[in-house]
C-alpha cells in the first residue's frame, strides 16, 4: 500500500479517515463567515503539518490563506481526529492482553519542543534540551504496542515507568529495558559499579539484553517519521497533549492496515 509522503497515509487510509472525521465534526458554519478551507483541505493541512512539521505561515502561503486560518483548522482537526479514532487507543491493560506470554521491550524517548521560560521542568538533563517524555512498549518483532501520555522532559525513565503503575504487571520474565529502569523489577543489564568488573554470567545477560533492545529503538524511530514528534514542537505547551493524542491514534490507525 503506497503511502503519500506529504500526509503520511495511503489514499485508502485517507479516505477512511476522512469519512470518520466527517462523522465526528460539523465543519461548515451555519452562521458568520464561511470557512476558507473545505473539510478535506483542512484534514490534509493537518496531516501535512504532523508529517513534516512545516510552519503554519508556510502552509498558509501554500494554500492561499492566512496563518490564523491554518491554526484554526489544525486545532479543530486535532480534536476531530482524536474523537474519530478513539477506538484505536491502547491502555496498559490492552498491551498485556495483546502481548500474552510474549516478551516485550520498554524505553523512553523525548519529543523536543521550544524552550519556554515559564516551563523549566521541560528541560531534560539527559538529552540537554526541552521536551515531553513518553514511554514506548513493543514486542520482540518491533511491533509497537503502547505509547504513554506525556510527562515533563525532566522526568527520569524509571519514575515515568512507575507512574504507569506497570510494576508487577511487567517483570524480569516478560519485559526487557535498559539501565535506566534498574529497580523497576524488569530485566535490565547489570551495572558495572565502580568498575569492579562483571562476572561471565553478567556479561552474557548484558549481551542478551542489548541484543534484543534494538527493536524498541526501531519502533520509536518509525513513530517519529511523523516529524512533529521528532523536531521541535513550536506551539504552546498547552496544545501538546491533544496534538500527541491525534498523532498516536493516526499511527495505530495506519498500523491496522498492515
Predicted regions and their residues:
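Short secondary-structure boundary/capping segments within folded domains
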Residues: 6-8, 34-37, 48
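Short, amphipathic alpha-helical "recognition" segments used to contact nucleic acids or chromatin
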Residues: 38-52
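Short, well-ordered secondary-structure "scaffold" segments embedded in the functional core
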Residues: 49, 58-258
Amino acid at each position: 500500500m503506497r503511502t503519500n509522503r506529504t500526509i503520511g497515509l495511503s489514499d485508502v487510509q485517507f479516505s477512511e479517515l476522512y469519512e470518520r472525521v466527517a462523522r465526528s465534526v460539523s465543519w461548515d458554519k451555519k452562521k458568520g463567515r464561511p470557512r476558507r478551507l473545505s473539510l478535506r483541505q483542512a484534514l490534509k493541512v493537518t496531516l501535512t503539518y504532523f508529517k513534516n512539521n512545516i510552519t503554519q505561515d508556510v502552509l498558509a502561503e501554500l494554500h492561499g490563506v492566512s496563518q490564523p486560518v491554518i491554526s484554526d483548522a489544525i486545532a479543530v482537526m486535532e480534536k476531530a481526529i482524536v474523537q474519530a479514532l478513539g477506538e484505536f487507543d491502547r491502555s496498559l491493560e490492552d498491551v498485556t492482553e495483546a502481548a500474552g506470554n510474549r516478551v516485550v521491550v520498554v524505553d523512553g524517548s523525548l519529543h523536543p519542543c521550544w524552550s519556554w521560560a515559564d516551563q523549566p521542568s521541560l528541560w531534560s538533563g539527559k538529552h540537554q534540551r526541552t521536551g515531553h517524555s513518553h514511554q514506548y512498549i513493543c514486542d520482540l518483532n518491533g511491533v509497537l504496542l503502547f505509547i504513554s501520555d506525556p510527562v515533563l522532559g525532566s522526568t527520569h525513565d524509571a519514575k515515568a515507568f512507575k507512574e504507569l503503575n506497570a510494576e508487577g504487571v511487567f517483570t524480569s520474565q516478560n519485559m526487557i529495558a535498559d539501565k535506566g529502569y534498574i529497580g523497576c523489577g524488569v530485566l535490565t543489564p547489570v551495572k558495572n559499579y565502580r568498575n569492579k568488573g562483571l562476572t561471565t554470567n553478567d556479561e552474557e545477560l548484558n549481551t542478551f539484553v542489548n541484543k534484543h533492545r534494538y527493536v524498541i529503538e526501531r519502533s520509536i524511530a518509525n513513530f517519529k517519521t511523523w516529524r512533529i514528534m521528532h523536531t521541535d514542537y513550536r506551539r504552546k505547551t498547552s496544545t501538546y497533549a491533544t496534538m500527541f493524542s491525534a498523532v498516536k491514534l493516526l499511527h495505530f490507525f495506519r498500523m491496522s492496515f498492515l
